[in-house]
Amino acid sequence: MTEVTSRKKAWVGKLTSATPNSRGMYIPAKKPPRAGPVRQGAGVVATRRPRSLLGKPSPLLRRIGQSLAVLPAYQSTPAYADAPPAFTEVGLRYSRYSEDSLDADKLIFGSRDRYDIDITQLWIEGPIGASWSVALDVQNDYQTGASPWFVGASQDGKAGVIMSGASIQDNRLEVGVTTRYFWADGNAGLKVSHSDEDDYEATSLAFDVSWNSEDNARTWTTSFSSSADTLTPTQGTIPVFIEREELDTQSMYFGVSQILSRTAIARIGLNYTYSEGYLSDPYKLRDQRPDTHERIALSTGYRQFFIAADASLQIDYRYYADSWGTDSHTLELGWAQNSRLGLVTPYLRYYSQRQADFYQVIAATDTPHFADDYRLSSYGAVTAGARWSMSLSEQWTVQLEAERYVSKNSWGLYDGEEAPALVDFWRTSINVTWRFD
């Protein structure tokens, strides 16, 4: 990471591999949550068909499965068919995350520009023998921009933001390897990943297993992950008061999906995450958080395919609560429409969060724990987006996605004073997949 003039990015502990994606659920990291490779089986509801149909599904079954399978990014939990992939798959994805500039009337000092992040992902997955598969995932993030340093009072007494006033540059590389074993009624996977950047290093290990009922109508999934992270902040013009800190995180998940009918499927899951170590943000002036953090999330999903419309209704809900006093609700509605041009899925997501116990708009430092990070405040947010996926041939698939995220204090379900640094952003991505024997 290179700091041009004054300070570096804001930092928060990252989520582990078994933890569902955080956007709209957990206090979002300064970087956008890692969006896992969009490959067959990743981030979909496990759908099971009678064994006699597994070999050559009808066109209708293929379209039903395609429409039912999509889960929102923030709720992706891996699910796989009980056989290794029939083909080797190579995928490349580019994403762009761009935050709006801070409003001029909310700025006291520094740059109004905020983060732009370019994310490039490459993955390769293929079968090994009759019962195994292996996958390699590589992700590179390049980030530039500025971030809030602290919140103070302007001359008229209103809360305003003191920004870094500098362009921050950061590059992160993450490499992960997953091996998976398949048997008649289930599968199990083991993933090892390592992430490295100038001031942050993390190594994680994740294990998951899924198994089916005798009639293949119900699938249970459980997973566990552990991550060991090390933070070594880089000193800038604005001083950082720590040299090295560590964070350990463990996460567990259990869920079940049930085929309700030929055209409907439902899912419910429970996730528990525990972190211990350094959880404060060293690049903020007034930030001293507890050294433990417990989080629990209950997620549900429902898919209903309409044969006449050749489309499916997608409904997802998640409730989240943690030991810092934060809880939140996330509701997403989507409509996956099959057409001659592919699968088009517009979606709308609503999110509302209660502020942490120790959050203050202008943080007072005379208490054991304090923070003025807007990500810990009370607010509501709306995301509107759409994704389009099209098979160009039997070997090539392309997917495009774009979404707009807007947050406001008044949109939330909970009381709390508005944080002046609330963020709005655009996110776009393009994904190309190649399958071959």
Where are these regions (language model features)?
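Outer-membrane beta-barrel "beta-signal"
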Residues: 422-437
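Outer-membrane beta-barrel translocator domains and adjoining extracellular loop/strand segments
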Residues: 101-109, 147-153, 191-193, 200-208, ...
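Residues on the lipid-exposed face of transmembrane beta-strands in outer-membrane beta-barrel proteins
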Residues: 122-126, 177-181, 207-211, 254-258, ...
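Transmembrane beta-strands of outer-membrane beta-barrel pores
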Residues: 94-100, 140-144, 183-185, 192-198, ...
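Extracellular loop and loop/strand-boundary signature of outer-membrane beta-barrel proteins
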Residues: 105-111, 160-165, 191-195, 206-208, ...
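Outer-membrane beta-barrel translocator/channel fold
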Residues: 103-104, 139-175, 219-277, 347-389
